[in-house]
Swiss-Prot record:
Region span, Disordered: 100-141, 497-549
Subcellular location: Nucleus
Annotated source species: Gallus gallus
Any one annotated GO CC term: nucleus
Protein name, entry field: Transcription factor RelB homolog
Amino acid sequence: MFAPSLAAFRAMALPIPRLAPVMKSVQPASFPVLGSMAARLSTARGGRGLRAGRRPPGGPKGAAAAEEMAVPIGAALQDPNVGMAPVNDDLEIIEEVMKEDGFQPDPPPPGSPHDPPKLIPRGLGVPVGRRDPPRDPPRLIITEQPKKTGMRFRYECEGRSAGSILGESSTEASKTLPAIELLNCQAIPEVQVTACLVWKDWPHRVHPHGLVGKDCSNGLCQVRLQPHANPRHSFSNLGIQCVKKKEIEAAIEKKLQLGIDPFKAGSLKNHQEVDMNVVRICFQASYRDGSGRTRQLSPVLSEPIFDKKSTNTSELRICRMNKESGPCTGGEELYLLCDKVQKEDIAVVFRKEPWEARADFSQADVHRQGAIVLRTPPYRCVQLSEPVQVEVFLQRLTDRARSRGCPYTYLPRERDAYGVKVKRKRGMPDLLEELSGADPYGIEAKRRKPPPGFMDHFAPLPAADEAFALLADPLDPLSHLPPPSTPQILWGRSYFRTPPPTETPTPPTASWGPICSQGTSEGGGGRTSPRYRPPPPLKWGSQWAPPHQ
């Protein structure tokens, strides 16, 4: 205890008008100095009117009059001189008490009556100022979280050819890495940071998978940092190596023997509960203090990292859609190509804030986990006056993960959905309108006519025409006549349906013409008579046959 002075009260920024009530409430037994000051102050308040120029009468009536004349502290007064009188009186009384009682012995504490009393200095020796705030303890923070998706866990037999874990803010143009920072560690010469893999959920047991890459061994990554030089560190070439199911127990026991258990969760007998497709990175820092003891900082967990090859946790992505627009009434058949998905754990959502609807398809419409055949849902308002663009994305039902959206446009409903008016107009053309139009001869229509298709370039098969060409036409009036005897007449009449050959073969003339032979005449004169031999018969589809000998 010490005896406070007026300067001490001013240093404490305690308002003087409020000092008297505080001193009145002080127990004299606990604080003798303040108690005596409070007693003298209350006694002197009866004579305040004397100093203010107002002397009350003596006796009990004078005491009552003095109490009536006493002005409460803090009350509003019309005369400022009268209002300052109580404050000045209090200051004078406090100064008198402080002068009389400069030092007071501190009463001995209870339980030790034989200890000598100690003298304490006056309030003038009390240091004025604020104490320095306590320093914040050292801690570790993650400045760049690892990317949740896009990383495929590799087996040991695959080697270390996979890419490293990227940062959360990585893009195609710029790549970032997971990073940490040590805070309030400038006075520590060296800090060791250990990174390991743990479960996604509480109690964050040690995961059987391990870290591989730079500064990694036994599934752990350990680096030594000097906070006074550089408190930040980025983890480059850091990958995740998965183990087989039969090696889960051995991998966990090996890490526990190395003392890797940040949350003291221990091992688990039933290792089937381990989620092999998702992990977290746990960062823990340790250092040695001045006495040589090892201090551990609180472990820090990263965001979950999902295996890319797992359909339950992989990144969803729409590759292509066969249509980009459709009627606002819905029901349009749409083909959607995507990455590998689970048919029982996927949905296709159409959204435009605040509206959202799912497409209609069943598990049988998911083909080989990579294609979905669906029907579009109707838009919230089918009475559209202009096209409305919405967003289409995939959504996993278990963890509510979503893919990037693809644009889809809802078109206004057609007034003539079945084309009745178009058909009526096509059946009854208006000739006057066509002749008086901009293209009366149909030249522009011919120009706009689509080019012939692929099948239009093929000619009909000639086998059928050749087969029917030799048959007589029942409608031909000359079909009963025999064919002409000479080739010139034969080809000139166009008897056959097929065109004549370019070069007509000339029959040999040696076998044609009259042949003179010896014979008897009718008159018996023994003269020879010429006998004409007809040409050989003509075979259709071939050249002229040689004559019979």
